[in-house]
Design a protein with these regions (language model features):
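Charged, glycine-interspersed solvent-exposed loop segments at helix/strand-loop junctions
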Residues: 109-176
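Short, glycine-/small-residue-enriched flexible loop/hinge segments at domain edges that mediate gating
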Residues: 44-58, 72-79
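Extracytoplasmic/secreted envelope proteins and their assembly/folding machinery
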Residues: 32-36, 59-63, 67, 85-86, ...
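Bacterial N-terminal signal peptides
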Residues: 1-3
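Terminal peptide-recognition signature
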Residues: 23, 47, 89, 164
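STAS-typified acidic loop motif
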Residues: 7-34
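Glycine-rich beta-to-alpha active-site loop
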Residues: 67, 71-112
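Sec/Tat-exported extracytoplasmic proteins
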Residues: 31, 39-43, 51, 66-70, ...
Length: 176
């Protein structure tokens, strides 16, 4: 078993061949490259998620890797996957949520999210960022009903069980 910090609060590999990676806690930019390198080296086939979110750009990088490498994503019945974590979950070609899945609209990063930022720059940044996110989510075959919640919800929106059933691509862990 291998644990790395702090890009996620906890990253653990399990299984005889490290086929399962468990990611819990906040998604941070610090040391993210090392964690992504470790995931690439161990080549897990399933990712278990439990995170309230964090750095969206780090999440997108991991999500792209998850999708490109056919890693299944899973949220257990006692887990939550919100905000940036949801992007990673949606990247799974085989994905199953039995817990809480939540999203909200994008916000400016801390380094440009202050009052002194030129409004035109901020608008351009947000539009480009949202465009890139939609393109990525389309690559993940994300159901279109997800987008209005992503664009209009200022606070966290937790999907209903009926909506999660439409987002899931498998019905049980046996199919993963």
């Amino acid at each position: 078993m291998f644990t790395v910090r702090p890009a996620f609060s906890d990253v653990t590999f399990e299984g005889a061949n490290n086929e399962i990676v468990i990611l819990t806690g906040d998604i941070e930019a610090e040391e993210f490259d090392e964690i992504l390198a470790e995931i690439k080296a161990k080549k897990p086939t399933q990712m278990i998620l439990d995170s309230e979110g964090g750095n969206g750009h780090s999440a997108r990088r991991l999500a792209k890797y998850v999708n490109d490498n056919n890693i299944s994503t899973y949220i257990s019945g006692v887990a939550k996957c919100r905000s940036a974590c949801a992007i990673i979950f949606l990247a799974g070609k085989k994905r199953l949520c039995e817990g809480v899945l939540g999203i909200h609209q994008a916000s400016l990063p801390k380094d440009i999210g202050n009052e002194e930022v030129n409004m035109n720059y901020a608008l351009k940044y947000i539009q480009e960022d949202i465009g890139n996110l939609i393109e990525l989510l389309n690559d993940f075959n994300t159901p279109s009903f997800v987008y209005p919640y992503m664009l209009k919800t200022t606070e966290m929106y937790n999907f209903s069980q009926e909506e999660i059933a439409q987002i899931n691509t498998v019905k049980s862990l046996d199919e993963m």
